[in-house]
């Protein structure tokens, strides 16, 4: 199930990108990133490893590229786009290292925090950034860095905002799948020690019934998101 959700999310992002490209073909304009987002970098608070060890909790602690830890409090609540500020800031194709995040979480000082500040949703901005090479705004030979000034001046090709309303449904499904995966991981971590110790007797599990439930779930998802409509799209 986790593997299916991950695969489905890949298709969803491909679909979102393809439809974004189609909207650009019909209508597009160049905008400065600083005109359509608000940077919330001033709200960031870094915690060193000792601080984090003393503050273990349920809230994700994000760095430049991924979740680094979990802590007992949060600084942000809601959807944001994180863009690596220093270190690993671009991929092999010169595009930015991005994280699409939601819920309650903490962010350190190695990621720029983008909040929506225009008619364009963060989902639209996330897709636009994913397809935009940004090597020209990266400075530093030893330690790569993207300054706030350079980031605000970054130019993006954007279609008409109203043509991107479909992104809300796609990303709602994306978030739902991610949350389900997190729940599956938590369930695995809780059950595995009991299975290994013999506390849970697997001989009493009805495998046929379990397979039936999984097959039914797969059929429902297949009807919602037919793979024939997703294959062949370009990320």
Region annotations inferred by a language model:
Residues 28-29, 50-52, 67, 72-76, ...:
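Short capping/connector residues at structural and topological boundaries
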Residues 1-47, 51-63, 157-204, 218-235:
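Non-catalytic DNA-recognition/assembly elements of restriction-modification systems
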Residues 17-22, 70, 110-113:
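Charged, low-complexity surface segments at secondary-structure and domain boundaries
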Residues 40, 129-132, 170-171, 209:
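Alpha-helix boundary/capping residues
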Residues 63-65, 74-130, 135-151:
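A short beta-sheet element
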Residues 34-93, 97-100, 211-214:
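DNA target-recognition patches
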Residues 1-3, 111-119, 134-136, 148-173:
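Proline-centric
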């Amino acid at each position: 199930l986790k593997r299916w959700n991950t695969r489905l999310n890949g298709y969803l992002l491909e679909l979102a990108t393809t439809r974004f490209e189609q909207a650009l073909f019909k209508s597009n304009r160049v905008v400065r990133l600083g005109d359509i987002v608000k940077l919330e970098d001033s709200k960031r608070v870094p915690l060193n490893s000792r601080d984090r060890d003393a503050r273990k909790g349920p809230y994700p602690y994000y760095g430049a590229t991924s979740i680094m830890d979990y802590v007992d409090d949060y600084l942000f609540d809601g959807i944001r786009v994180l863009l690596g500020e220093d270190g690993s800031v671009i991929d092999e194709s010169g595009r930015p290292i991005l994280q699409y995040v939601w819920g309650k979480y903490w962010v350190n000082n190695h990621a720029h925090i983008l909040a929506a500040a225009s008619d364009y949703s963060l989902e639209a901005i996330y897709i636009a950034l994913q397809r935009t090479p940004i090597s020209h705004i990266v400075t530093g030979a030893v330690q790569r860095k993207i300054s706030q000034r350079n980031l605000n001046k970054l130019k993006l090709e954007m279609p008409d905002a109203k043509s991107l309303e479909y992104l809300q449904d796609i990303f709602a499904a994306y978030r739902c799948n991610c949350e389900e995966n997190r729940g599956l991981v938590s369930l695995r971590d809780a059950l595995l020690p009991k299975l290994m110790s013999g506390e849970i007797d697997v001989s009493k599990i009805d495998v046929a019934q379990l397979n039936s439930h999984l097959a039914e779930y797969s059929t429902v998802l297949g009807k919602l998101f037919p793979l024939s409509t997703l294959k062949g799209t370009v990320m």
